[in-house]
Amino acid sequence: MKQKLLELILTHAYRYSEQPFTLASGKKSRHYFNCKEITLVPDRLELLCKFIVERHLDESGILKPQAFGGLTMGADPICYGISLEFRKQDKNIYPLIVRKFSKDHGTNKLVEGAVHEVKSCVIVDDVITTGGSTIQAIRSMRDSGIVVVQGICILDRQEGGMDAILAEGVQMFPIFKKSDFGNLEHE
């Protein structure tokens, strides 16, 4: 299953360009991983979430909390998919979504979902570079009274993000590291 995910990422999510891409962190890179090509395609998302629930959580020693949540939009489909995989086991594990900015109407909440049902959460992200988006989500969860126990991501670009998140007190467990892809073409 993990090998199939790696192949899907290389085939559908990985891009190389002589003209560097601007990453969410603001950094520039010729190597771009658009994991939404995995998470927004139903059969690929299903495989990813099935792998996370059936293998990655146990292999990494990740605690099974009451929720999985992260910053919109990278985490959204992953959190929903994980929740649905747990429903197949008759377990309610809630998806939580962290807004980038609070709304100026309604409840003005940054964290959406069954927050009143949740005391602990595994933070989720698709790709980690500097860790800035994940740290924003962790802080918003904590401000909402939720304990972030650990984290998962599809890909660690190995550019310091894991250390920055660990400095926030959260250990991340990536499914893949950039180095897992070997010598990427055009290195």
Curated annotation (Swiss-Prot):
GO terms for biological process: 'de novo' UMP biosynthetic process; pyrimidine nucleobase biosynthetic process. One of its GO terms (molecular function) is magnesium ion binding. Coiled coil: none annotated. Its cofactor is Mg(2+). Orotate binds at T129, R157. The keyword Nucleus does not apply. It is an enzyme of class 2 (transferase). It catalyses: orotidine 5'-phosphate + diphosphate = orotate + 5-phospho-alpha-D-ribose 1-diphosphate. InterPro entries: OPRT (IPR023031), Or_phspho_trans_dom (IPR004467), PRibTrfase_dom (IPR000836), PRTase-like (IPR029057). Pathway: Pyrimidine metabolism; UMP biosynthesis via de novo pathway; UMP from orotate: step 1/2. Its EC number is 2.4.2.10. Pfam families: Pribosyltran (PF00156). CDD domains: PRTases_typeI. Catalyzes the transfer of a ribosyl phosphate group from 5-phosphoribose 1-diphosphate to orotate, leading to the formation of orotidine monophosphate (OMP). Homodimer. PANTHER family: OROTATE PHOSPHORIBOSYLTRANSFERASE, URIDINE 5'-MONOPHOSPHATE SYNTHASE. This is Orotate phosphoribosyltransferase. The gene is pyrE.
